[in-house]
Amino acid sequence: MSKVKAEYIWIDGYSPTANLRSKTMIVDGPVNELNDLPEWGFDGSSTEQAAGDNSDCALKPVYYVPDPIRRKDHLLVMCEVLNADNTVHKSNTRAACVDLATKHKDHESWFGIEQEYTFYNGENPLGFPDEGYPAPQGEYYCGVGANNIYGREIVE
């Protein structure tokens, strides 16, 4: 039986911007299914998920993938956060999403991701004039062509 490093990963309770947290459990391998990964506890008072006098929270594995850094049989384990009584923690927004997806499983989900970023040339965004601002975005929003879009060679 091999030993597997399972990196349990969860979202903390900080607001307005939550952070990722993780800790490693050594489990007997190989891990063949989600049920091979046990629930695990953590101190929620250190992650803004519980008060200091009642700080127990639980990590419930919901998905795992091979660990690209440690390799071999080691894993990254995505977890939901539960209260000590196994109810859904208020910071666990995934649980509500799963409930909605289950309730509306007969409908097709559509979503889009728009990755926004800005390249800089010195103190100005790439392609901006040295003084002031460019013309209104109409010409270059979702634009095509070297006269409208800058930095394409980096993006591609």
Describe these PLM feature segments:
Residues 1-156:
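Glycine-rich, acidic/polar active-site loops that bind/position phosphate-bearing ligands
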